[in-house]
Amino acid sequence: TSIVQRAEVSQRRINELLDQKTDLLSEENIESTLAGALEVNHLSFVYPDSGVQALRDISFSIAAGQTLGIIGTTGSGKSTLANLLMRMYDASTGEILVDGRPIQQYSLASLRSQIGVVPQDVFLFSDTIANNIAFGLDQPNLDRITQAAKDADVYQNILDFPKGFETLLGERGITLSGGQKQRVSIARAIVKEPKILILDDCLSAVDTKTENAILNSLQKIMKNRTSIIISHRVSSAKLADQIIVLDEGRIVERGDHGSLMEQKGVYAALFEKQTQGGESVEESAH
């Protein structure tokens, strides 16, 4: 029947994906618990397929538990840097050290299990809210799911739905607002209690008021956890201990919010433009 034929084609495609071998090999398969210190030395990256150079001679370090803001416009190399920190690719030149060890020495599964990522485009399954948050846990744990929802400031929203955590999302269920989606995505990233948290321009789709509310709840989540806030909005990165400004794959400025404003360069210009352009940067987020 046509359904069986369609299923066969789908299975073939899935098998092709499952049979693919990764080029990323772990040199020593280290599986230690991370503290979260990161050091990037003279990192450059060229995309192998297109030959486009996305990053040029990037260097910075973050102590365990600190927050780094990475600011830049579209195409500046922000997300490429996030992908390298998750070891989706290996650097063309230079190195990334995690807790003083080259990133290649860690077991990929162990490394990635300790990194929580909130992507720009949230993908939620047609499943319950609980299962969407629990995605990434080996065993669903209601206490951890509940705590993650509270930390992401979406717990009360969930309780307001008729079936609470068992509420279905997607085609057969309800549709969440942009802010609720992002909060569920944040809960999903932190439910596995990662040592490193990467926010990849994840607040670009929400309005400023929602952004400030989410940033306030993120402050608690980021405390004592190495966090990287990637954004084109200055308001998202204001909280960071250290901020780097990327332009065409290079670091053009670095400092904290105050010192970067005093430099009156790219960062300050972006801040002024975004503040005047209606993307108000409220002090409440500080």
Predicted features by range, described:
Residues 17-20, 135:
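Coiled-coil segment of the histidine kinase dimerization/signal-transmission module
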Residues 25-26, 31-286:
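ABC-type nucleotide-binding domain
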